Regions:
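Non-ligating segments of multi-cofactor redox enzymes
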Residues: 1-87, 96, 101-167
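Basic, alpha-helical nucleic-acid-binding regions used in initiation and control of genome expression
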Residues: 91
Length: 167
């Protein structure tokens, strides 16, 4: 019921903050796996999220050259990855369509700015957050994602050649 005591609490914000549930979503962020946000970024600029975004608030420019990703495989990377948070409707479609588990939903909701235009465009440097951060805000989901990525990496490893038969 709407009138339950648990639902009718007053919080002295910003001194006190309610704990957000794990499945809450606000705005997307990019996950990186190493200590370097640029080198460890999971995004390979495939632009699927940009194409699928209903309000078209994601802007990606693919790099000209390839560089090794966090697994050592040469990949393209986003030279530019911007999200216009004044347009984003937090629908999570970008997260669902990403085949590389590179984009996830954040719990940060305090993104107000004094300026109206350029400050509401989140750049790649602002969007990149570590896998450790992802584990802190979505622990159950992050464990499952990491297990799936590890299983996929093991599956792609080449099988060692069999020893020649003696005879």
């Amino acid at each position: 019921s709407y009138f339950e005591k648990d639902r009718l609490t007053t919080v002295q914000y910003p001194e006190e903050r309610d704990v957000l549930p794990e499945n809450s979503r606000n705005f997307p962020f990019l996950v990186f796996d190493t200590n370097d946000p640029e080198a460890g970024l999971r995004c390979v600029a495939c632009k699927i999220c940009e194409k699928e975004c209903p309000p078209q608030c994601i802007y990606i420019v693919k790099s000209e050259e390839k560089k090794p990703d966090y697994m050592g495989k040469p990949q393209f990377y986003p030279a530019t990855f911007d999200i216009d948070i004044s347009v984003c409707m937090s629908c999570q479609i970008c997260v669902e369509v990403c085949p590389f588990e590179a984009i996830k939903m954040d719990k940060v909701y305090e993104l107000s700015r004094r300026e109206r235009f350029d400050a509401l465009l989140m750049r790649k440097q602002d969007l990149a957050k570590s896998n450790d951060y992802y584990h802190r805000i979505h622990p159950l989901e992050a464990e499952a994602v990491d297990a799936n990525l590890k299983a996929a990496a093991e599956k792609k490893k080449p099988v060692p050649a069999a020893a020649p038969a003696s005879g």
